[in-house]
Amino acid sequence: MQISSRSGFGYFSYGIRLALTPGIRRFVVLPLLANIILVGGAMYYLFSHLDTWISEWIGQLPSFLSWLSYVLWPLLALTILATFSYFFSTLANFIASPFNGLLAEKVEQHLSGERIGEEGVWALVKDVPRILSREWRKLLYVLPKALGLFLLLLIPALGQTLGPIAWFLFTAWMLAIQYCDYPFDNHKISFHDMRNTLKQNQSKAYGFGMLVAFFTSIPIVNLFIVPVAVCGATAMWVMEFKTQHSPLRQ
């Protein structure tokens, strides 16, 4: 099946079509269930506390910047939603990572017509330790940067103005890494090489990640994002990156 090159936004939209494709849909179910359970519970908790958190945070602004509260409230709300959703989506992805990898494999097979690896339950079970190790590698990459940005948020005025923008861009980048990594990992391409490939294609990576971050912050919609993002990221791999790494395939 031939697909044309798209923008990062375009690959996300294409992911919706792929997730609904016959032959792919049955591999969407388990990642979808993990996301609904964890993110759904997190969103319920978040919305019961969101107004209080934002009011307390804006209250730290100096009085001469109080006029910014009208601008910052929606920006902070979006940032908190995106960050909260990213955290719990990451947890859901960690738990469902073997099934996300399987979904990426089936999408690539659908798009390229090539068999990617061994099939069957035993093949999936054998891959679980490697897949979970890869998820830990992502967490080790994320945590120091997330801590630095959290400290930025604690700086009066600066944290309330530049902090939300920095968090949104960081979330977009990390979501691009999170979902694009599944097809890379299926081909045993190192995390370092995957990250460098995305750095060389930042417009597509950020475009894709921003759209995932935006929809991840929308209640109800965010429950269905994981399989869509896996499908879209796999389409990006097939069209944009696969030929660059063909000598590395095993």
Curated annotation (Swiss-Prot):
Locations listed in the record: Cell inner membrane
Record carries keyword Transmembrane: yes
Origin superkingdom: Bacteria
GO molecular function: high-affinity sulfate:proton symporter activity
Transmembrane annotation, as ranges: 27-47, 64-84, 150-170, 210-230
Protein family per UniProt: Belongs to the CysZ family.
PANTHER family: SULFATE TRANSPORTER CYSZ
Name this protein carries in UniProt: Sulfate transporter CysZ
Lineage: Bacteria, Pseudomonadati, Pseudomonadota, Gammaproteobacteria, Vibrionales
